[in-house]
Amino acid sequence: MPDAAVTLRPQRPADLPLLVGADTPFDDFGPMAVGAHPAPSRLDDAGALTVVDASGQVAGDVSWHWRAWGPNAGSRCAMIGIWLRPEHRGRGLGRAAQRRVVELFFTHTRVNRVEAHTDVENVAEQRALEGAGFTREGLLRGAQWRDGAYRDGVLYAVLRADLAPRP
């Protein structure tokens, strides 16, 4: 399936009412803090971008923060997350937006790895990540609070070499 047409842009104040108040079974720990990040001045900062569909409607947001796997800057990776409004789910926008943000990181930073994780029961997001080029790497036991209990998550990652053009 080809990627849906999607644009990623800095968040605007007018976006926030559309992005607050998540309607998803995977968020029961309190109000979403979507838009809490200032618009990033650089991809190197933690932040979020608004996901806009082909018709110009705000569909959700994709955000990121940094994780270190070693003591030096070369050992860090970006951890991304996505939230889509219910009426925009199941149309390929999540896959396209996550693929696009990975491309932005690999084009504009020296990062070698981009990660994402999701609830073990969120099969739709697992498919979206796999469609965006991510590889399932493992189970994160008891990593996420949901539905009154700690739940398992699934870790995904994509490496720069995974998306390199093949000869």
Stretch-by-stretch model annotation:
Residues 1-25, 48, 52-167:
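Acyl-donor (CoA/ACP) binding surface of acyl/acetyltransferases
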Residues 27-54:
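Active-site rim helix/loop that mediates acceptor-substrate recognition in acyltransferases
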